[in-house]
Amino acid sequence: MHGPHPTVKDIELSLAPEDIPVVCNVQLDEEDYTDVVEPAQQAYRVVTVCPKCSLPLRLVVECSHADIRALERLLLGTLKLVCPRCV
């Protein structure tokens, strides 16, 4: 503003977002990476039948206990495994 009294033309109402650079200079030690515990992986056999032709289907998955429970919920719901012949 210039002059002893502010006028409307002297007031700038600009609310544009400003680009603020985000810089992080923190380096993690090697031991910070080793603290993360991966869930134990285990092989599970899944045996079911094709819903179209009733042929047996077998597959093996390797996952955590929580993931096999999630797969079980999907298979008990609307997810169906179909054999290659019926696709």
UniProtKB/Swiss-Prot annotation:
Gene assigned in the entry: E7
Sequence segments annotated as region (E7 terminal domain): 1-38
Assembly information from the UniProt record: Homodimer. Homooligomer. Interacts with host RB1; this interaction induces dissociation of RB1-E2F1 complex thereby disrupting RB1 activity. Interacts with host EP300; this interaction represses EP300 transcriptional activity. Interacts with protein E2; this interaction inhibits E7 oncogenic activity. Interacts with host TMEM173/STING; this interaction impairs the ability of TMEM173/STING to sense cytosolic DNA and promote the production of type I interferon (IFN-alpha and IFN-beta).
Post-translational modification remark: Highly phosphorylated.
Start and end residues, zinc fingers (unnamed): 50-86
Molecular function in Gene Ontology: DNA binding; DNA-binding transcription factor activity; protein domain specific binding; zinc ion binding
Family: Belongs to the papillomaviridae E7 protein family.
Domain of life per record: Viruses
Keywords tagged on the record: Activator, DNA-binding, Early protein, G1/S host cell cycle checkpoint dysregulation by virus, Host cytoplasm, Host nucleus, Host-virus interaction, Inhibition of host innate immune response by virus, Inhibition of host interferon signaling pathway by virus, Interferon antiviral system evasion, Metal-binding, Modulation of host cell cycle by virus, Oncogene, Transcription, Transcription regulation, Viral immunoevasion, Zinc, Zinc-finger
Chain's role: Plays a role in viral genome replication by driving entry of quiescent cells into the cell cycle. Stimulation of progression from G1 to S phase allows the virus to efficiently use the cellular DNA replicating machinery to achieve viral genome replication. E7 protein has both transforming and trans-activating activities. Induces the disassembly of the E2F1 transcription factor from RB1, with subsequent transcriptional activation of E2F1-regulated S-phase genes. Interferes with host histone deacetylation mediated by HDAC1 and HDAC2, leading to transcription activation.
SUPFAM superfamilies reported for this sequence: E7 C-terminal domain-like
GO cellular component, one term: host cell cytoplasm
Example GO biological process: symbiont-mediated perturbation of host cell cycle G1/S transition checkpoint
Subcellular location per the Swiss-Prot or TrEMBL entry: Host cytoplasm; Host nucleus
Lineage: Viruses, Monodnaviria, Shotokuvirae, Cossaviricota, Papovaviricetes
Organism encoding this protein: Human papillomavirus type 94
Protein's UniProt name: Protein E7
Motif Nuclear export signal location, chain numbering: 68-76
Domain comment as written in the entry: The E7 terminal domain is an intrinsically disordered domain, whose flexibility and conformational transitions confer target adaptability to the oncoprotein. It allows adaptation to a variety of protein targets and exposes the PEST degradation sequence that regulates its turnover in the cell.
